[in-house]
Amino acid sequence: MKVTQEKLPASQIGLEIEITPEITQKTYEQVIKNLSRTVNIPGFRKGKVPRQVLLQRLGKTHIKAAALEELLQDGIEQAIKQESIAAIGQPRLRSSFDDLINSYEPGQPLTFTAAVDVEPEINLVQYTGLEAKAEEIKYDPARVDEVLEKERQELATLIPVEGRAAQIGDVAVVDFKGVIAKAEGDDENAEPEPIPGGDASDFQVELQEDKFIPGFVTGIVGMNPGDTKEVSAQFPDPYVNQELAGKPAIFTVTLKEIKEKELPELNDDFAQEVSDFDTLEALRASLAERYQKEAEDKTKNNQQEALLGELVKHIEVDLPETLIEKEVDAMLTQTAMRLSQQGLDVKKLFTQDIIPQLRERSRPEAVERLKRSLGLQEVAKRESIAVTPEEIQARVTELVQQYPDEDIDVERLHTIVENELLSEKIIDWLLANSTIELVPEGSLASQESEITAPETEAETIEVTAESTTGE
């Protein structure tokens, strides 16, 4: 079999394949023989159908098409093997199948073209001496006080209050019923449109403005138990229920009771109730250590992201469609798994109509991820960076001990750990051979917001789903 190769865009190899007359005839005859054994033709037993009857009944074009399918499949497979091509994904026929049917004659040579994806060639123009900026996240001691105060709020005892009006910080017990406020030009005599789910009895609302839709809490402040009044409010935009987003509303509110919070003292007893520590001092120290490490980890992550972003700029690679599609598949699978773990019906979110949009909008991120991965692999190859079996086993043992009750696929865990350790080593090497300038938190975010990449449809679905479950 004669095979001619050519290099095509997107890391493809084009193949011109010429199949010998002997093979085209032999395959055609074999197809006729196989069909005669399987086709039911009245008046003839299977395997005893005369050749001419079979040709008349099925038609020569049908038989040629069946033979051609075998010739193409076998021809491509043999060509890849003959030329020692490390193909990835499924080969693609470049010639028109209809044209091939018309030109194919058993006993004559058959020439057609196909293409296969191969691993891309990576040109890493620069990977040492990279320069980038990353935001430094500094530990804020005030976070410890904020966490402790939040715990106090959650452990607060509600004490009924009499003889005064409701004020910010109280907990109000109310009955309410809401309607959509009429806009200018609406029929004044029409019945107000009730808000779906916009009524409740004995509803406890904490009088903090961020605890309800804007205007609702402000309207309750100043009311006395027993008072009923109309409170104007407005649904935010965006809002979980898009039909209500941005619409003004009127709530008829009856204040039934006022309660105020009695907070526990911040002492050792409090520390023992909310944690495993015996003293408040020990709890504070633990929280401080946690948030210091969190700040350090975030700073390191920012450095890594800045480094990888800079590395990608110096990678020249023509990605094959097979790798991009595979990466998109992985991204959507990860998104589906996360949503499923949240208890959401993935089938309702990932409809047949939206999946093509998801795939298309996920491509830019898939390409970015592939470039990062291939870039790191190339650095490891050039600098002979590797992980040892001992390093892998140590990390695996550590993880298994952390989750003694989990049913762990140890072989798969080995693979995951090996990849993670290798990535860590490569990134550490790159950091040591690059300059990442740390800048104040927020200074880069403002610049990036001016050039914001559109979020993927999968991210949109996740945000919407999280908002729905959070209400």
Swiss-Prot record:
Keyword Transport appears in the UniProt entry: no
Chief location bin: cytoplasm
Compartments it resides in: Cytoplasm
Annotated catalysed reactions: [protein]-peptidylproline (omega=180) = [protein]-peptidylproline (omega=0)
Record's protein name: Trigger factor
Location of the region described as Disordered in the Swiss-Prot/TrEMBL record: 443-471
Domain notes: Consists of 3 domains; the N-terminus binds the ribosome, the middle domain has PPIase activity, while the C-terminus has intrinsic chaperone activity on its own.
GO molecular function: peptidyl-prolyl cis-trans isomerase activity; protein folding chaperone; ribosome binding
EC number of the protein: 5.2.1.8
Alphabetized SUPFAM superfamilies for the sequence: FKBP-like, Triger factor/SurA peptide-binding domain-like, Trigger factor ribosome-binding domain
Limits of the PPIase FKBP-type domain: 169-264
Family listed: Belongs to the FKBP-type PPIase family. Tig subfamily.
Keywords (A to Z) from UniProt: Cell cycle, Cell division, Chaperone, Cytoplasm, Isomerase, Rotamase
Major enzyme class: isomerase
Bias type Low complexity, positions: 448-471
Domain of life: Bacteria
Chain segments annotated as transmembrane: none
GO cellular component terms, A-Z: cytoplasm
Entry function: Involved in protein export. Acts as a chaperone by maintaining the newly synthesized protein in an open conformation. Functions as a peptidyl-prolyl cis-trans isomerase.
Example GO biological process: 'de novo' cotranslational protein folding
